[in-house]
């Protein structure tokens, strides 16, 4: 084994010199330069500084403007709530521990940080799945005359919480566990050991199949079908400029959605799977730290991709920030009108760019 395993931790360094200590009790400055911990703390501060206002503003603007309280926006609000869970329950803890150079909050703090980070990430992931399914059902119409209503939105939100808890709760009760990872300042699922009594192997396989591979497959399938439907509609109305514009808008949205998901989560999932399947191989603390901390940036990407690209929401947000007036009223109004025209045109071919 190319690491040191303790009762509730795994440090990626062989303890041949006797310097390895528990990440709950001692600074881990022997792993990397102490300046690296300061950089992590600064990075987490940046995510908090940006992530909290953006996601809180999403909730506040939606509550202030009744026209934004649509069934589909329930899912988008759920996404913002998930991001706030990550910011408040995970990012603040990680920033604090990074400032100290070890997981100063102890085993209980590790469980809480790992739980909130996993819960928030999974709620966000399954919210994206619900959005993908909603777009596929409404746009491609595999079910005739289906209308996405408030009841469907509530069921979708409940589903995201159910699936998120199915992934984040078991490690609290003995099916796998949360341990410090990377530079030992943040906690995650134990991919590193086969500790007796925790059944890490079965949980990691369950998590990768049910909470990564399946959601990714659903997202690709739904948005793939959506893109095909938009292209078919555009081909049938090649002389319609509004339809062509709608095709470009939907294509851009789909590409950004898929790329954003992959950029945030694929590096972390790939490294975690590599560590799980190559237990005993040599790897440094930075090997897991970089993708783990990069995945946390999804709390910023999500609202920008799924909320700020919505013209109506952007108009309401500017109105709120500017004390009830939108200084870009004419430009935003023209843009919103064009968007509505595109939606109406493409709707006649059973496609909507929203």
From Swiss-Prot:
GO terms for cellular component: membrane; photoreceptor disc membrane; plasma membrane. Photoreceptor required for image-forming vision at low light intensity. While most salt water fish species use retinal as chromophore, most freshwater fish use 3-dehydroretinal, or a mixture of retinal and 3-dehydroretinal. Light-induced isomerization of 11-cis to all-trans retinal triggers a conformational change that activates signaling via G-proteins. Subsequent receptor phosphorylation mediates displacement of the bound G-protein alpha subunit by arrestin and terminates signaling. The modification N6-(retinylidene)lysine is found at residue 296. Glycans are attached at residues 2, 15. InterPro entries: GPCR_opsins (IPR050125), GPCR_Rhodpsn (IPR000276), GPCR_Rhodpsn_7TM (IPR017452), Opsin (IPR001760), Retinal_BS (IPR027430), Rhodopsin (IPR000732), Rhodopsin_N (IPR019477). It is found in: Membrane; Cell projection, Cilium, Photoreceptor outer segment. It is a multi-pass membrane protein. Disulfide bonds join 110-187. Residues 334-354 have a biased composition (Low complexity). Its main location: membrane. GO terms for molecular function: 11-cis retinal binding; G protein-coupled photoreceptor activity. SUPFAM superfamilies: Family A G protein-coupled receptor-like (SSF81321). Pfam families: 7tm_1, Rhodopsin_N. A motif ('Ionic lock' involved in activated form stabilization) lies at residues 134-136. This is Rhodopsin. A lipid is attached at residues 322-323 (S-palmitoyl cysteine). The lineage of its organism: Eukaryota, Metazoa, Chordata, Craniata, Vertebrata. Belongs to the G-protein coupled receptor 1 family. Opsin subfamily. Phosphorylated on some or all of the serine and threonine residues present in the C-terminal region. Contains one covalently linked retinal chromophore. The chain crosses the membrane at residues 37-61, 74-96, 111-133, 153-173, 203-224, 253-274, 287-308.
